[in-house]
Curated annotation (Swiss-Prot):
Enzyme class (EC, first level): isomerase
Protein name per Swiss-Prot or TrEMBL: Diaminopimelate epimerase
Gene Ontology molecular function terms on file: diaminopimelate epimerase activity
Origin organism lineage: Bacteria, Bacillati, Actinomycetota, Actinomycetes, Mycobacteriales
Gene Ontology BP annotations: lysine biosynthetic process via diaminopimelate
Gene3D superfamilies membership: Diaminopimelate Epimerase, Chain A, domain 1 (3.10.310.10)
PANTHER family: DIAMINOPIMELATE EPIMERASE, DIAMINOPIMELATE EPIMERASE, CHLOROPLASTIC
Organism: Mycolicibacterium gilvum (strain PYR-GCK) (Mycobacterium gilvum (strain PYR-GCK))
Length: 289
């Protein structure tokens, strides 16, 4: 089994090329592979396949709305093995992998996901690095909510970016205060509002066209970055300013991305790095099932 390792602003992934969607990705096996001590280690797994192959293999019962059978399909799994609808950083790395591996020669194409089609543009790309924009779809405001993070209670805006987020802007929070906050420990939220869990972003108020953010991802814990989370953060920060559209730079521990929000869409631009290629031991993989 061949694999690659990559990251988008230090949100890291194992990529498994499986064009016929033949591999058995049980939650147990994925969790073992993503474990940083007994596996390769990653925030998540990206199976590289097509929507038609995933459909034929029973990954889903019907094609996600707007996704064609011949579209590339990013089958994304969280580090705990659970299935996730979308991953903005993952799409950038996925698109970069296709281009670097010679599987895709266009600079603009569509990556399918459970959240629907995600058009991508590769502005620059080589075998190791890339600059990629992902059309993330409309970010939907879903009311307000609260979460307790690091022993502090935060109020935030619920945002659907193909997956659920609670983005909490704190006017009093400084960069130093954000850096010292315990985001790694389990967070508390309203499970009736978010029955399937939620990604929680804590961010500073926007200053000079930028915000700083940390994130606790459902099924993973704190990560160095979260693509859909940066979009949710930008929506919440703009809302905090009384705006519904605009462009913001979002600084995360793993780097910086640029998010543009319009009335009908959102766009995420940032880097991708492919750092390793290798082969999994078949015996080890079989033992994880």
């Amino acid at each position: 089994m061949k694999f690659a390792k990559g990251h988008g602003t230090q949100n890291d992934f194992v990529l498994l090329p499986d064009l016929n969607a033949q591999y058995s990705l049980t939650a147990r096996a994925v969790a073992a592979l993503c474990d940083r001590r007994r596996g390769l280690g990653a925030d998540g797994l990206l199976r590289v396949t097509t929507a038609g192959a995933a459909l034929a293999a029973g990954v889903f019962d019907r094609l996600p709305e707007g996704v064609a059978e011949d579209d590339w399909f990013m089958d994304y799994r969280n580090a705990d093995g659970s299935i996730a609808e979308m991953c903005g950083n993952g799409v950038r790395v996925f698109a970069h992998y296709l281009h670097a591996g010679g599987l895709e020669h266009r600079s603009e194409f569509v990556v399918g996901s459970l959240a629907g089609p995600r058009p991508v543009v590769l502005h620059e790309a080589d075998d190791t690095t890339a600059d990629v924009t992902v059309e993330m779809g409309k970010a939907v405001r879903c009311g307000t909510g609260t979460a307790t993070v690091g022993g502090r209670r935060f109020s935030g805006l619920a945002v659907d970016v193909g997956n659920p987020h609670l983005a909490c802007v704190d006017e009093e929070l400084t960069d130093a205060g954000l850096a010292s906050l315990d985001v790694a420990s389990p967070v508390a939220f309203d499970s009736t509002q978010f029955p399937h869990g939620v990604n929680v972003e804590i961010l500073t108020a926007p200053r000079d066209g930028a915000v700083a953010m940390r994130v606790h991802e459902r099924g993973v814990g704190e990560t160095r970055s979260c693509g859909t989370g940066t979009v949710a953060a930008a929506v919440a920060a703009l809302d905090h300013q009384g705006a519904r559209t605009g462009t913001l730079r979002v600084r995360i521990p793993g780097g910086e991305v640029c998010v543009t929000v319009t009335e009908t869409d959102s766009y995420l631009r940032g880097p991708s790095v492919l750092l390793a290629h290798g082969e999994l031991a078949e015996q080890w993989w079989a033992a994880q099932h």
